Regions:
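Conserved AAA+/SF3 P-loop NTPase catalytic/coupling segment centered on the Walker-B
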Residues: 59-81, 112-121
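DNA transaction DNA-binding modules
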Residues: 19, 63, 69, 166-214
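P-loop NTPase catalytic core of nucleic-acid-dependent motor ATPases
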Residues: 1-57
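A short, charged helix-loop
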Residues: 128-146
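Conserved Walker
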Residues: 41-49, 66-68, 84-102, 109-118
């Protein structure tokens, strides 16, 4: 999906944790709420072009069970989060290009992935704990319960976004913003519009980045 003229950037979500912490399941659940459709998850292909092709067919690029991220994929993910493009010479042509553009939300999960600093600065990292045996559920039971809860979940999300948009449209002075300035400003509007503690989202993003550098 190319970037509409007035849309800013996203932040990535990285779920990590040991085996049995439901990393894949959690990203599937999140995607099913904000971007239902198939495939639920993707694995990186052999070429960064595959990322852009996949991004063009969804709103959330959900990358499952990654073990490492190469420099090329790191750069592509940063570009997709911020809204960018990738060009390649058109087959059987000497002077024509095929252009891929994308601006997508990205979910990543894996046991222990070392993110490079530029991607880390755009990412919220959450470490999950192992689910105790007595609390485990079958996929069928889990999804059945989720379907019952989805209307209330979506109602809460849409109400929060509506409050944020009202606040955003008022215009306000912001504190110093991160490199994801559009995301940062909207996060403040989200907090103000819903009566949440202001600055907590940007504080979490900053702490994630600093922890990732250690």
């Amino acid at each position: 999906r190319g970037r509409p003229g007035n849309r800013g950037s996203y932040a990535a979500l990285y779920l990590t944790g040991p085996e049995g912490s439901a990393k894949s399941t959690n990203t599937k659940i999140l995607k099913s709420i904000v971007d239902p459709g198939t495939p639920e998850t993707r694995t990186p292909g052999s070429d960064v072009r595959d990322l852009y092709i996949g991004a063009a067919r969804c709103h959330v690029l959900n990358l499952d069970n990654l073990s490492h991220i190469t420099r090329d994929y790191n750069d592509a993910l940063c570009s997709i989060i911020s809204g960018g493009g990738f060009a390649r010479k058109l087959n059987y042509s000497d002077d024509e290009e095929m252009i891929f553009e994308a601006c997508n939300m990205i979910f990543i999960n894996g046991i222990s992935i070392k993110l490079m600093p530029d991607l880390m600065s755009r990412t919220f990292q959450i470490e999950l704990a192992v689910i105790p045996e007595e609390e485990r559920k079958t996929e069928a039971d889990l999804w059945q319960e989720l379907e019952k809860l989805k209307p209330a979940i979506l109602s809460g999300i849409l109400t929060a976004l509506s409050n944020a948009l009202k606040e955003y449209q008022k215009g306000f002075i912001t504190p110093p913003l991160p490199r994801l300035a559009d995301f940062g400003k909207f996060s403040i509007a989200l907090e103000r519009g819903n009566g949440w503690i202001e600055g907590k989202t940007l504080e979490a993003l900053k702490n994630n980045y600093e922890d990732g550098l250690e």
